[in-house]
């Protein structure tokens, strides 16, 4: 039985990946999930798998070398899938040090512990071991307003926020380990994810939640910044396929081919909520474009992201299966069915943060 060590598995993408892997492999694999359970980590995301005999949760910070070394010492880890990261640009602008510590130092700890566990006396590595570092397209910077411009694996790094700079630094550490030690690893750089379990500081769940509660829908700047949207289950599938079929030491871009302006996303959510809510639901009456409120633009706000997933399609056969219209309906339906989840995660610290970011502007 292959054993996976998943970091940040209680977060949005990590928990969706764990669900995907158990749906696909069931009892053929074992997953150890390491998460510090900071504000965006939520064990409710994993209540459907927590009683499985082949699932283990360990509360630990990836910066804690002793805790991570202990996991490797007590388990024969075959694969590391490294999601754990601070990931919200707005928070990075307010508290950049936290992002450097988790994203850079934490990745260094994970690499060192995996290397120590997997390296043989002659400097080679045990057969079948692999470290997959999950990163972002934001490391590439911003694209011009040109529909023919895309990020490729060869695009030079040009990060513009503390978040993207910290992720670029972590990518470079992984590249250095691959080059220096021939460490068995891959890097994936993905576009914006959306889907179930996403913490509502991110655009899509924020807009869904605010619209359902009749609150303003904040839009940075002119709302014309473009992002490429990737349904999270498609991303989970891509990560699994890179683990199984990806060439060692390679980077693969994972994009959704769903490029849309932020304001367009908001209009689509409003229209979809209107379509999906029954006329008898009193919330339907107040969900309209009047809720849209333009706020001061984010510092260093990149204008356009768009990924060309040509390499992963050609080498591995992965491509995004979920178009945005389908994905947003599935996402909204999930939030309809899990309103208790949303209510739980939007209380306390989140509400304080939301007020600081949007209500005071």
Each model region followed by its residue ranges:
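N-terminal Rossmann-like NAD(P)+-binding domain of SDR-like oxidoreductases, especially those catalyzing
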Residues: 1-193, 243, 272, 338, ...
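C-terminal substrate-binding subdomain of Rossmann-fold SDR/epimerase-dehydratase oxidoreductases
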Residues: 16-20, 24-25, 31, 60, ...
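Residues at alpha-helix caps and immediate loop-helix transition turns in enzyme cores, especially N-
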Residues: 17, 42-45, 95, 199-203, ...
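Tryptophan-centric aromatic hotspots in well-structured domains and transmembrane helices
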Residues: 39, 88, 99, 151, ...
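Loop/helix-junction capping segments adjacent to catalytic residues or to phosphate/diphosphate-binding pockets
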Residues: 40, 65, 197, 263, ...
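A glycine/serine/threonine-rich, flexible loop-to-helix segment
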Residues: 49, 147, 200-208
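Residue-level recognition of oxygen-bearing side chains
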Residues: 67, 98, 105, 199-203, ...
């Amino acid at each position: 039985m292959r054993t996976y060590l998943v970091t940040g598995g209680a977060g949005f993408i990590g928990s969706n990946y764990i669900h995907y892997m158990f749906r696909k492999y069931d009892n053929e694999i074992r997953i150890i999930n390491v998460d510090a359970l900071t504000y965006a980590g939520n064990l409710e995301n994993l209540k459907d798998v927590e009683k499985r005999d082949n699932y283990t949760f360990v509360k630990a910070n990836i910066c804690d070398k002793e805790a991570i070394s202990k996991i490797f010492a007590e388990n024969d880890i075959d694969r590391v899938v490294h999601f754990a990261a601070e990931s919200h640009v707005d928070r990075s602008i307010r508290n950049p040090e936290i992002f450097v510590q988790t994203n850079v130092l934490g990745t260094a700890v994970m690499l060192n512990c995996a290397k120590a566990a997997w390296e043989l006396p002659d400097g080679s590595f045990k057969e079948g071991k692999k470290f997959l570092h999950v990163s972002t397209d934001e490391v590439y910077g911003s694209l011009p307003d040109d529909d023919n411009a895309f990020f490729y694996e060869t695009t030079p790094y040009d990060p513009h926020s503390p978040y993207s700079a910290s992720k670029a630094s972590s990518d470079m550490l992984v590249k250095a380990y691959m080059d220096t030690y021939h460490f068995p690893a891959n890097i994936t750089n993905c576009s914006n994810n959306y889907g179930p379990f996403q913490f509502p500081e991110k655009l899509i769940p924020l807009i869904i939640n605010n619209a359902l509660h009749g609150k303003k829908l904040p839009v940075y700047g002119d709302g014309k910044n473009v992002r490429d949207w990737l349904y999270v289950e498609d991303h989970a599938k891509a990560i699994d396929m890179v683990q199984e079929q990806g060439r060692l030491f390679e980077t693969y871009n994972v994009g959704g081919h769903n490029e849309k302006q932020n304001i367009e996303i908001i209009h689509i959510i409003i229209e979809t909520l209107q379509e999906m809510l029954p006329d008898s639901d009193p919330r339907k009456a107040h969900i309209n474009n009047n809720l849209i409120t333009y706020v001061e633009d984010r510092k260093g706000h990149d204008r356009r992201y768009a990924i060309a997933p040509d390499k992963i399609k050609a080498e591995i056969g992965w491509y995004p299966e979920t178009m945005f219209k389908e994905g947003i309906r599935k996402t909204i339906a999930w939030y309809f069915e899990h309103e208790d989840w949303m209510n739980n995660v939007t209380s306390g610290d989140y509400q304080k943060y939301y007020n600081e970011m949007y209500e005071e502007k």
